[in-house]
Regions:
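Active-site-adjacent loop/helix surface patches within enzyme catalytic domains
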Residues: 2-123
Length: 124
C-alpha cells in the first residue's frame, strides 16, 4: 500500500491501512474518538487495523511507550466507530478522528495506561 506523510508532526511512523474511504458528503472531522484496542499485544492490534479485509482502522495508534503511528490520513474516513450516532449525528466515522490506544483491556487484566502513553494521547 502507498504510504503518506503524517498529518501530525508527533507521529513517529506511518503504517498505512487499506481499510478506509472518503468521508461522506464532504464532511470534515469535528470530533475525536478514543478507543483502546482490547487485544493481547501491539502486533495483533496493528495487524487487525492494517490488514485488508478486517474492515477496521483508525487514524492513529498510540503505543504503550508513547510512540504515535498514523494509519489513515485525517482527510479520509477510518472505520473505527461502526454503525454509530451521537448527539443527533449519524455516521460518526465521517466526522471524527479515530485514535486507538494500545491496551489489552478487560480480558487481559485491564492494565493501567502508562504515563508516556497518556502524555502522547494528550499531545495528539
Amino acid at each position: 500500500m502507498k504510504t503518506f506523510t503524517p498529518d501530525s508532526s508527533i507521529a513517529s511512523d506511518v503504517i498505512p491501512s487499506p481499510n478506509h474511504g472518503d468521508r461522506n458528503n464532504g464532511r470534515v472531522a469535528d470530533m475525536i474518538l478514543l478507543h483502546y484496542t482490547g487485544m493481547p499485544d501491539v502486533e495483533g492490534a496493528i495487524a487487525q487495523l492494517c490488514t485488508p479485509g478486517t474492515d477496521k482502522s483508525a487514524h492513529y495508534i498510540v503505543l504503550e511507550d508513547g510512540r504515535i503511528v498514523q494509519s489513515v490520513p485525517e482527510a479520509k474516513r477510518a472505520w473505527h466507530a461502526g454503525i454509530s450516532s451521537w448527539a443527533g449525528e449519524e455516521d460518526i466515522n465521517s466526522c471524527s478522528i479515530g485514535v486507538e490506544i494500545i491496551n489489552r483491556g478487560h480480558d487481559w487484566g485491564y492494565p493501567d495506561f502508562p504515563s508516556r502513553q497518556i502524555a502522547a494521547v494528550t499531545a495528539l
